[in-house]
């Protein structure tokens, strides 16, 4: 290879990242127009397009590099010089952290995810820690209640870039003041002020005003979801002011916000429970989130004396799941062979996981990160898990002596399996869990997702008590399913027969059958019948299908119905 080529390659990679991020910003900047035009299908398409941008531009850069090098192989010293040149380009580069992840992606594509060493990749950042903590420009504006909170909120709302009419701005402002007074008290509220992000956060059918409520005793989140009426008028649906509520809004089971990456550091104060990876994931920088997630894993591994074990819960028929006992993620490997009743391929399973990545997860499907050639030290693997890996996934494992390499796996947020949760709780907690499970099914269905296997073991409970679906191998679109009523028996003997008295075709689903496994527990059955009996009726599911086919996009709320202003204060007049 001629000398000087290393710098050209480094510049080509960085220029490729510039092109990718420019398109990312272009798609993001269209969010306001899509919201104002209530073009909800364009919102969904933009989300998918933004996800695909990254891999598309990595592919373009890889092709450029193959042309530059004429397809010649490169030695280790050459690659190290490329990385050195790339590193020298970053000190004055504003998006250095994401640019490092882009370099990693190009390298992995070129070398088929092999030889992934810290010398060749930015496994940890090349830049000093202070750069991560520096906010490059003012990202928010302060508002003080010099003339009272009504005047303050009027200024905040009037500053918004939205061009639609408000349904009743005065009403919404009084709702917010009432909520803040109930939360803080009159005296504390008078001594507090707001800091509001310059950018609105767009997701699904809402535009979120995100701010910080700075009080005498500390800083709280200040989140206002702005929706549209059927007539295209704006209204504020609620006000959220706790870190738990904010954490759910920015949760790992939700679609990515249409907003800019520079806001990550600013958000950290109101989302103290979120890791850096989770913050980048929330705003749609999922590839850099993957880098940060891997860094968090390495840091945890360095500081613990734990071994990987099989994850608690009922063993899956498709996935082998393992974890570190104190770590908040699970690792999922597709088995070499599935249980006989699982008539599918590994490629089908991967396609299902990709569908979830691109689809609106409505707060009910866990996001995942996909890794290839994942290296584990044998000393970190319990003997029982090693035996299980070799038994269930040997075709995906390469033995390197002191290490093994797993050809492909997913990393996902760890939750308590719902079946275990239901065994451990009672009273109101049990009731809440059953309500959450039914709501999860409804919201998935409204988003055109049918889970397929609805057993409790395929759902998890988050630290905030939300129920989230995480087993995707049987997932499909609602519009692909044929929901049928079970025909009446022809003779009394039909109900006693081992085989059904009616024909069953692929894609047929009989909701009446859900009752057999969802209501078998006498503690759960009555609660389910009380709250979710309509899930056992085929006509309920067919009605949802009709709404989807008619193009209706359901509203998705990141909070409980009882928190909506229309429910809390609906009868109040201002």
UniProtKB/Swiss-Prot annotation:
The active site is at 367. Keywords: ATP-binding, Cytoplasm, Glyoxylate bypass, Hydrolase, Kinase, Nucleotide-binding, Protein phosphatase, Serine/threonine-protein kinase, Transferase, Tricarboxylic acid cycle. Pfam families: AceK_kinase, AceK_regulatory. GO terms for cellular component: cytoplasm. Its EC number is 2.7.11.5, 3.1.3.-. It is found in: Cytoplasm. ATP binds at residues 311-317, 332. One of its GO terms (molecular function) is [isocitrate dehydrogenase (NADP+)] kinase activity. The keyword ATP-binding applies. It comes from the Bacteria. One of its GO terms (biological process) is glucose metabolic process. Belongs to the AceK family. Bifunctional enzyme which can phosphorylate or dephosphorylate isocitrate dehydrogenase (IDH) on a specific serine residue. This is a regulatory mechanism which enables bacteria to bypass the Krebs cycle via the glyoxylate shunt in response to the source of carbon. When bacteria are grown on glucose, IDH is fully active and unphosphorylated, but when grown on acetate or ethanol, the activity of IDH declines drastically concomitant with its phosphorylation. PANTHER family: ISOCITRATE DEHYDROGENASE KINASE_PHOSPHATASE (PTHR39559:SF1), PTHR39559. This is Isocitrate dehydrogenase kinase/phosphatase. It comes from Shigella boydii serotype 4 (strain Sb227). The gene is aceK.
């Amino acid at each position: 290879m001629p000398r000087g080529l290393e710098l050209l390659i480094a510049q080509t990679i960085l220029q490729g990242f510039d092109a990718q991020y420019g398109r990312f910003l272009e798609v993001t900047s269209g969010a306001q127009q899509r919201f104002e035009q209530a073009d909800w299908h364009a919102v969904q398409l933009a989300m998918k397009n933004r996800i695909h941008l990254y891999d598309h531009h990595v592919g373009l850069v890889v092709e450029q590099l193959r042309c530059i090098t004429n397809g010649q192989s490169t030695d280790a010293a050459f690659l190290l010089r490329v990385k050195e040149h790339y590193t020298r380009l970053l000190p004055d580069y504003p998006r250095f952290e994401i640019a490092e992840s882009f370099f990693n992606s190009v390298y992995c594509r070129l070398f088929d995810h092999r030889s992934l060493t810290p010398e060749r990749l930015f496994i940890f950042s090349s830049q000093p820690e202070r750069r991560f903590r520096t906010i490059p420009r003012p990202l928010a504006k302060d508002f003080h209640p010099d003339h009272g909170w009504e005047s303050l909120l009027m200024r905040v709302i009037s500053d918004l870039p939205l061009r639609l009419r408000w349904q009743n701005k005065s009403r919404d402002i009084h709702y917010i003041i009432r909520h803040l007074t109930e939360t803080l008290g009159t005296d504390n509220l008078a001594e507090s002020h707001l800091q509001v992000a310059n950018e609105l956060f767009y997701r699904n059918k809402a535009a979120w005003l995100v701010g910080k409520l700075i009080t005498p005793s500390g800083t709280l989140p200040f989140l206002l979801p702005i929706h549209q009426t059927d007539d295209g008028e704006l209204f504020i649906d609620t006000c959220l002011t706790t870190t738990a509520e904010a954490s759910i809004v920015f949760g790992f089971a939700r679609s990515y916000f249409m907003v800019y990456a520079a806001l990550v550091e600013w958000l950290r104060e109101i989302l103290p429970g979120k890791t850096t990876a989770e913050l980048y994931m929330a705003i749609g920088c999922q590839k850099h989130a993957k880098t940060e997630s891997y860094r968090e894993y390495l840091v945890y591994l360095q500081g613990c004396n734990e071994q990987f074990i099989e994850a608690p819960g009922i063993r899956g028929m498709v996935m082998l799941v393992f974890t570190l006992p104190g770590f908040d993620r699970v690792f999922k490997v597709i088995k070499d062979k599935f249980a006989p009743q699982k008539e599918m391929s590994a490629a089908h399973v991967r396609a299902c996981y990709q569908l979830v990545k691109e689809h609106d997860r409505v707060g009910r499907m866990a996001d995942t990160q996909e890794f290839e050639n994942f290296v584990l030290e044998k000393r970190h693997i319990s003997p029982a898990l090693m035996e299980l890996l070799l038994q269930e996934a040997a075709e995906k494992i390469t033995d390197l002596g002191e290490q093994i390499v797993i050809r492909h796996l997913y990393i996902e947020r760890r939750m308590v399996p719902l079946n275990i949760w239901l065994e451990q709780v009672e009273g109101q907690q049990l009731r809440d869990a059953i309500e959450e499970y039914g709501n999860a099914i409804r919201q998935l269905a409204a988003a055109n997702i049918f889970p397929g296997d609805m057993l409790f073991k395929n759902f998890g409970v988050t630290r905030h008590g939300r129920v989230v679906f995480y087993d995707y191998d049987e997932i499909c679109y609602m519009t692909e399913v044929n929901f049928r009523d079970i025909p009446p028996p022809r003779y009394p003997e039909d109900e006693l027969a081992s085989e059904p008295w009616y024909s069953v075709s692929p894609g047929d689903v009989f909701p009446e059958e859900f009752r057999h496994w969802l209501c078998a527990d006498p503690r759960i059955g009555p609660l389910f019948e009380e709250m979710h009996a309509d899930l056992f009726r085929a006509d309920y599911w067919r009605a949802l299908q009709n709404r989807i086919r008619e193009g209706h996009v359901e509203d998705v709320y990141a909070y409980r119905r009882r928190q909506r202003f229309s429910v809390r204060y609906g009868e109040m007049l201002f």
